[in-house]
Amino acid sequence: MAEFKRLLAQLCCDEKQEEELLSYASACGNDGADGLVLIDNAKTDEEHEFHIGLIRKMARAIDIPIFAGGRVKRLEDVKKYLYAGAKGVFLDVSVEENVDMIKEAADRFGSEKIFIRLNDAAQTKRIPEYAQLGASMAFLGEEVLPEAAEVIRTMEEQMHYYVMSSSGETEALAKELK
């Protein structure tokens, strides 16, 4: 199997930065990113709806897939992200209600569209459970990588992984997975 790396650009939404975010998304696509991870940190329903609209605009403007998540409180939120143009939705499994939602979301929308986001090393022990429930991909915060490496090696046929690094240490992080 040929080895390759995928570059996913990550951005957190802020309502006040719509033009900058659209410009950034376009630049990511033009500069070779393989996808865009959009983290919706909305605190209100109005902000959340704004971010849904932003996904819709980005999906029309760029040719790379968008993966969205962050503020998922119910299955309706998953549907809104997907209908807005996200290729997949990640559920933050530090929120137990999101773990409970994995199977229902995978059954309704397809497991290829349901991902998990791990930011806590304790969650890595549950990766097999998340895969069994229907999650097909995991976004790993760099802080969980050392603990996740062994689980990833045993589960790589069932789930794909992407490391989300904000430190720029992606080369060192990638070596941890080998």
What is the predicted function of each stretch?
Residues 42-46, 69, 90:
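Conserved short-loop catalytic and cofactor-binding motifs
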Residues 99-115, 126-137, 174-177:
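Contiguous hydrophobic segments
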Residues 70, 91-94, 141-142:
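Short beta->alpha connector loops at strand-helix junctions that form conserved
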Residues 42, 73, 95-96, 144, ...:
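Conserved beta-strand edge residues that scaffold enzyme active sites
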Residues 23-26, 94, 111, 136, ...:
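Generic serine detector
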Residues 61-89, 123-133, 149-178:
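Catalytic cores of alpha/beta
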Residues 78-120:
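Hydrophobic, well-structured mid-protein blocks that either form specific transmembrane helices
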Residues 1-64, 75-76, 116, 120-139, ...:
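Conserved N-terminal beta1-alpha1 strand-loop-helix module at the mouth
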